[in-house]
């Protein structure tokens, strides 16, 4: 199943000790993964100020949906830290242990204000539950 670009992206920020977390909503793995990418990017910068000018394709693997979530978001952080490109939108297909994803994003403009500097995605309190309509992710600041 393809994720739908026209859906309403929904997430809420949750406090977690000295870290920051999000709860993202969706009815499928694809929606949860997509909303998690957007939520993390929006925690980093105001995504509405970015102009989409980058696209890439990657297959993200993992033994569990939780592994895929951590690997996916860690990959987004890698591109931000290494190439100053923030991917904030994906379209994807998920099947057992594999997420085939197209990433869309932007080079980070000079002088843009960072909302948060996320160091890592954690397994702390991690949950990926499309059958219950949500995923919870905690980020190390």
From Swiss-Prot:
Coiled-coil positions = none
Q: Which UniProt keywords apply?
A: Calcium, Metal-binding, tRNA processing
Which Pfam families does UniProt cross-reference here?
Archease
Q: Which residues hold Ca(2+)?
A: 19, 140
Q: Do you know which HAMAP family this protein is assigned to?
A: Archease_arch
Record's family?
A: Belongs to the archease family.
Q: Which NCBIfam families does UniProt cross-reference here?
A: PRK00407.1 (NF001617)
* Purpose: Activates the tRNA-splicing ligase complex by facilitating the enzymatic turnover of catalytic subunit RtcB. Acts by promoting the guanylylation of RtcB, a key intermediate step in tRNA ligation. Can also alter the NTP specificity of RtcB such that ATP, dGTP or ITP is used efficiently.
Name of the protein: Protein archease
Q: Which organism is it from?
A: Thermoplasma acidophilum (strain ATCC 25905 / DSM 1728 / JCM 9062 / NBRC 15155 / AMRC-C165)
